[in-house]
UniProtKB/Swiss-Prot annotation:
Lineage, uppermost ranks: Bacteria, Pseudomonadati, Pseudomonadota, Alphaproteobacteria, Maricaulales
One cellular component (GO) term of this entry: cytoplasm
Protein name, entry field: Serine--tRNA ligase
Record EC number: 6.1.1.11
Biological process, per Gene Ontology: selenocysteine biosynthetic process; seryl-tRNA aminoacylation
Similarity remark: Belongs to the class-II aminoacyl-tRNA synthetase family. Type-1 seryl-tRNA synthetase subfamily.
Catalysed reaction, written as an equation: tRNA(Ser) + L-serine + ATP = L-seryl-tRNA(Ser) + AMP + diphosphate + H(+); tRNA(Sec) + L-serine + ATP = L-seryl-tRNA(Sec) + AMP + diphosphate + H(+)
Record-annotated membrane-spanning stretches: none
Protein source organism: Maricaulis maris (strain MCS10)
Domain note: Consists of two distinct domains, a catalytic core and a N-terminal extension that is involved in tRNA binding.
Metabolic or biological pathway, per its Swiss-Prot or TrEMBL entry: Aminoacyl-tRNA biosynthesis; selenocysteinyl-tRNA(Sec) biosynthesis; L-seryl-tRNA(Sec) from L-serine and tRNA(Sec): step 1/1
């Protein structure tokens, strides 16, 4: 959410930020709506002040027995009452329209974000690891999983429809091992607090993180008007909502392992084979709540935490700085981690780490008070996948496959697999 005062003070800078997103100028419309709202509020306040003054005079007129003056004053109060009602309705109308406009606008990009239209314009920052040279043609994760008899898309489709999977045996255990490994790493080495959050949230929560109102079609809604979480970012970030936090309590770093639910409404025909794009998938999420001064450094730190997961899993990856046309709605700056997929001979996204500045905090009214200062300020929020468990499983299968179809378990996961070194059919 954007601050209308900042837009009034810096309309050209605001429009320039929108232009980086490929959007037309909006400041003039927003400022006009705000002016109409403030004019209505001014009329309401003036009428309220005048009515209060007349009310005192009515009492005096009644006490003195001046019936004509009493009736005149009462008639004037009735007129002011109508003005109050009309101006109040106008103020509420303009406030609602203004907030609808503001809520539909994405965050403005950081000055460091490269200009671009889509993922083709993203900028590679660095790489880690070399893709393994295999003496055989690598198989994709679907072929590997089905050959092991432990990945069942057919039965999952009979139960739930397309874009679902049932994992069994060693692969089900591998999925659990990956999540436990990631949680242990983030909590014991990276300083995150583990949270077990709700999987269903209210409108206010998904509005706060920016999925509503613009992306409702990407979500699943229950019959009692809850939303299934598309990511643990939603409940974790909202733990800071409607609170003034002490500076001494910051940063807050939280992590959670949850299922995520997405309709993939805009992904028809994309990644229809396999586990890359499912309606339900598992993910370990990281969320940081920080002061504005810490925001940029925290993004680098968070990205490094996600990178450590991939390094310990011995998975080659690259870090991409997203361009203005590929960033998420609430993001101010984003790094994507893309892991090597041998069967596709390319890198695929496995983690996305973003700083949102105060964009989400304004929507949630999440603030902090600096030591020694009376007036609170808005927090900065960050989120990142640490990492997507399903895609990590896919990457482990493909990068650690053997010619006979077995999977070598990375050393970091073996303690979580009861010492098992291979998954075999």
């Amino acid at each position: 959410m954007h601050d209308i005062k900042l837009i009034r003070d810096n309309p050209d800078a605001f429009d320039a930020g929108l232009a980086m997103r490929g959007l037309p100028a909006q400041s003039a419309t927003l400022i006009e709506l705000d002016a109409s709202r403030r004019e209505a509020l001014g009329k309401q306040q003036d009428a309220e002040t005048e009515r209060n003054a007349l009310s005192k005079q009515i009492g005096k007129a009644k006490a003195s027995g001046d019936e004509a003056e009493f009736n005149r004053l009462r008639s004037e109060v009735d007129r002011l009452k109508a003005v109050l009602e009309e101006s109040g309705q106008q103020a509420r109308h303009f406030d609602e329209v203004l907030n609808q406009h503001l809520a539909a606008l994405p965050n403005l990009p950081h000055a460091d974000v490269p200009q671009g239209a889509d993922e083709a314009d993203n900028v590679e920052e660095r790489r880690w690891g070399e893709p393994r040279t295999m003496a055989f043609t690598p198989r994709d994760h679907v072929d590997l999983g089905e050959s092991l008899g432990q990945m069942d898309f057919k039965k999952a489709a009979e139960i739930s429809g397309s874009r679902f999977v049932a994992l069994r045996g060693g692969l089900a255990r591998l999925e659990r091992a990956l999540a436990q490994f990631m949680l242990d790493l983030h909590t014991t080495e990276h300083g995150y607090e583990e949270v077990s959050p709700p999987y269903m949230v209210r409108d206010e929560a998904v509005f706060g993180t920016g999925q509503l109102p613009k992306f409702a079609e990407d979500l699943f809604r229950t019959t009692d008007d809850h939303w299934l979480i598309p990511t643990a970012e939603v409940p974790l970030t909202n733990l800071a909502r409607e609170t003034i936090h002490a500076e001494a309590d910051l940063p807050m770093r939280m992590t959670a392992y949850t299922p995520c639910f997405r309709s993939e409404a805009g992904s028809a025909g994309r990644d229809t084979r396999g586990m890359i794009r499912l309606h339900q998938f598992q993910k370990v999420e990281m969320v940081s709540i920080v002061t504005p001064d810490e925001s940029d450094a925290e993004l680098e730190r968070m990205t490094g935490c996600a990178e450590k997961v991939l390094q310990l899993l011995e998975l080659p990856y690259r870090v991409m700085k997203l361009c203005t046309g590929d960033m998420g709605f609430a993001a101010r700056r984003t790094y994507d981690l893309e892991v090597w997929m041998p069967s596709q001979d390319c890198y695929r996204e496995i983690s996305s780490c973003s700083t949102c500045g105060d964009f989400q905090a304004r929507r949630m009214d999440a603030r902090f008070r600096k030591e020694g200062e009376k007036r609170p300020a808005f927090l900065h929020t960050l989120n990142g996948s640490g990492v997507a468990v399903g895609r990590a499983l896919v990457a482990v299968l493909e990068n650690h496959q053997n010619e006979d179809g077995s999977i070598t378990i990375p050393a970091a996961l073996r303690p979580y697999m009861g010492g098992v070194e291979r998954i075999e059919g």
